[in-house]
């Protein structure tokens, strides 16, 4: 589950960063938009099942906050 700025291009930037980190988006659901923030559930296949690199890449994007991760 992630929160990001609710403005054009934010989700595209997030998706590009996931791909650059080797992640493969398997599902995406826009949960809500509130107070200028978008909240999305994203299912990502991560190489080697270790999300550390992905979390570091996402943490470097301004305004993006990883709220929770759930291993599958």
Predicted regions and their residues:
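A conserved regulatory-domain signal marking ACT and ACT-like small-molecule sensing domains
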Residues: 1-72
